[in-house]
Amino acid sequence: MKQLIFLLICLLSLLQYRLWLGDNNLSEYVLLQTQIAGQEQSNGKLVARNQILKEEIIDLKRGTEAIEERARNELGMVKEGETFYRVVGSELRERNPFNR
């Protein structure tokens, strides 16, 4: 009976050693769980970004309004015969050193 108890204590000690100090121990498990959570969050952001880009591509393929909007906003283009007016807010006028 004493030998059985000694054997069980040795087995329990070995298992405890592997749990706390061995390869793939408990602290590594917790570290990996936090890394997985961070990666899942990053993946979620990338999936949302990809969805926005897909919708933009579909919009650009279907019609000319999206192309016209990009040309106006990003390239500053205007239609033929159209007059472009830029309205400068009061904040920009106050910051402009040449407006005195």
From Swiss-Prot:
GO biological process terms on file: FtsZ-dependent cytokinesis
InterPro entries: Cell_div_FtsB (IPR023081), FtsL/DivIC (IPR007060)
Topology in membrane: Single-pass type II membrane protein
UniProt feature coiled coil, ranges: 49-73
Parts of the chain that traverse the membrane: 4-21
Subcellular location: Cell inner membrane
Topology feature Periplasmic, residues: 22-100
The entry's keywords: Cell cycle, Cell division, Cell inner membrane, Cell membrane, Coiled coil, Membrane, Transmembrane, Transmembrane helix
Gene Ontology cellular-component terms listed: cell division site; cell septum; plasma membrane
Positions of disulphide bridges: none
Biological role stated in the UniProt entry: Essential cell division protein. May link together the upstream cell division proteins, which are predominantly cytoplasmic, with the downstream cell division proteins, which are predominantly periplasmic.
PANTHER family for the chain: CELL DIVISION PROTEIN FTSB (PTHR37485:SF1)
Quaternary structure and interacting proteins, as annotated: Part of a complex composed of FtsB, FtsL and FtsQ.
Name the UniProt record assigns to this protein: Cell division protein FtsB
Species assigned in the record: Shewanella frigidimarina (strain NCIMB 400)
